[in-house]
Amino acid sequence: MMASKDFLDKLVQTCPDGIIGIDRKGTVIIFNAAAEKLTGLAGKDVIGKLSIQDVYPDPEIAREVKKQIYSKEHGAPGSVEGLEVTVKGPEGRKIPIRLSAALIFEDEVEVGSVGFFHDLTDRKELEEELRRRSITDSLTNLYNRRHFHTTLMEAMARFARYKRPLSMAVFDLDNFKPFNDTYGHQEGDNILRLVTECTRSVFRQTDHTFRLGGDEFAVLLVETDLAKAGQVMERFKAHFTEEWSLKMEYLGRTLRPVTMSIGVAQLAVGEKADKFQLRADLAMYEAKSAGGNRVVLASKKIGE
């Protein structure tokens, strides 16, 4: 059997998690193959030459890790378990890891510490993908109704704090069901995707567009008053009509024209979210009742 030191060296080097050992001064003295892969650094360039602080993207992280090791928050004093931090990866990327570390003592004297670095990149990417799917409409890749309510409350909180105007537009496609019945759901889906393309051409990155369901959509226009929001939605409506015509011309097809009815409301001071949305909805219904293919600005109060 191989000598115990050789066995321990093999054990350290073959461990799938990064292992970094430091002396009492903070200089790296152990840097296994997994740590090399994680950070993009070669052990020969690290051991005896770099400090543990050089492994983290921010010195504050190293200080926080040291603080946690000496506290009881993540384990017994002298150790830390499951602390999620980031380390510097190849090309300066920040790599999320789960850190477990412990102080090393000889004759009750602290001589260094060892840390185990478990790469969380795959898990974090999966979590982000699941989060994205939970707030996104699968057909259009716009935000869904669930995220609409969350985003609306956040936007209203900013409005209450900064007093900058916030407007909402709600719109749907005129006679969408007859269109679907005539040409099939695939053609209907193509229209919904075209709506998405047009939103990206007209609205700012700071605005938020949602598919609420079916052919109903909503847009939150930040720092935009009612008059300006109305102008933006008129431009959006015209752009959609133009893109639809160009698409039909390109495909050499003649389908029933598609238009939209749009209602726009501006948030009033002290107004609740449900009333804000209701005013936009009522304005949209008014546009539809008047024949569709138009933008209607909501009254400040319901019934006015």
Write out the residue ranges for each language-model feature.
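PAS-family sensory domains
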Residues: 109-119
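PAS-family sensory/regulatory domains
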Residues: 45-60
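A short pre-motif secondary-structure segment
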Residues: 208-211
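Short regulatory alpha-helical coupling segments
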Residues: 131-132, 145-165, 196-204, 222
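Conserved nucleotide-binding and Mg2+-coordinating catalytic segments in signaling enzymes
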Residues: 131-150, 171-184, 193
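Terminal output helix/cap of sensory domains in signal transduction proteins
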Residues: 57-93, 232
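Catalytic-core segments of nucleotide cyclases and related cyclic-nucleotide turnover enzymes
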Residues: 226, 230, 234, 253, ...
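Sensory-domain boundary capping and coupling elements
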Residues: 99-101, 117
